[in-house]
Amino acid sequence: MNKANDYTLGVEMIPLSMGEFFEEIDHIRDAIRQIEDNVGRIEMLHQQSLQEIDEANIAATTRHLEGYTSDTRRLQTSVQLAIRSLESQNMQLPPDNDTATRKTQTEAVKKKFMDQIRHFLQIEKTYRAQYEQRMRRQLEIANPRATEDDFQTAINEENGGQVFAQALLRSNRSGEARTALREVQERHADIKRIERTIAELAQLFQDMATMVQEQEPMVDKIVTDAVNVRTNMGEGTQHMDRAIKSARAARKKKWICFGICVVIICVIVAVLCGVLIPVLGNRH
């Protein structure tokens, strides 16, 4: 996980050793714990923001929220890439006990990560509803005659709060109404930020759920390559076996020829001896 930012999606990776694998699992667990801590702080800051009435304090709380949300997004991306990498590696390995252990451990951290995404998603949805309630109350203070359509415009349109605010500021409403209106604008920004986070979390959860299907083409290629390698190795072994047999046969033939030559030489020597010895004896 400490190298998670170096992972490239869809690129084959050499499987880690068992020691490296468990080290990676520990890194992922640490990152998930950090995400849990961040989400706890985000929840606390949401509650604090709802209770604040001072503009400066609200702005400071918003900055903290944005910081923790950004850091959590970064950690989630790293964890997603790390789990994706481990799943890809697991699919390249033979079906033995070590591979079963890897798959079990990978699935465990993946489940924990997805549970954490669900938890964060629920928190954001809960506080989005509370921000809307707070915004509605402030709108009612700012403009008691505001309709449901006015409220929906202020909530849903990107610049709805600002448009509503400008219309009211041109009126003769009291200072209390104008103060409430400033909070409406701030809550509108909070709601939009939460909506973006909710959309990102929902997409992340979906990506994690469909990760295996996305990897299938890559895995098929890995398996095909592995089969081709084994086939080529098998063919190479067969060729080598034939070459060895041919070499052995050639050596055997050479020894046979050598033996025949030796026998022929011996016969020739014997014949010569049988002829020459009597002749030499008669001369004497």
From Swiss-Prot:
Q: List the disulfide bonds.
A: none
Question: Which UniProt keyword terms apply here?
Answer: Cell membrane, Coiled coil, Membrane, Transmembrane, Transmembrane helix
Residues in a coiled coil are 23-57
List the GO biological process terms: ascospore formation; ascospore-type prospore membrane formation; exocytosis; intracellular protein transport; vesicle docking; vesicle fusion
> A single Pfam family, by name?
Syntaxin
Q: Name one GO molecular function term.
A: SNAP receptor activity
What is the topology of this protein in the membrane according to its UniProt annotation?
Single-pass type IV membrane protein
User: InterPro entries, per this entry?
Assistant: SNARE, Syntaxin, Syntaxin/epimorphin_CS, Syntaxin_N, T_SNARE_dom
t-SNARE coiled-coil homology domain sequence ranges: 181-243
Q: Which domain of life is it from?
A: Eukaryota
- What compartments host this protein? Cell membrane; Prospore membrane
Q: Spell out the family assignment given in the record's similarity comment.
A: Belongs to the syntaxin family.
This protein is called Syntaxin-like protein psy1
Task: Specify the species.
Answer: Schizosaccharomyces pombe (strain 972 / ATCC 24843)
- Its gene? psy1
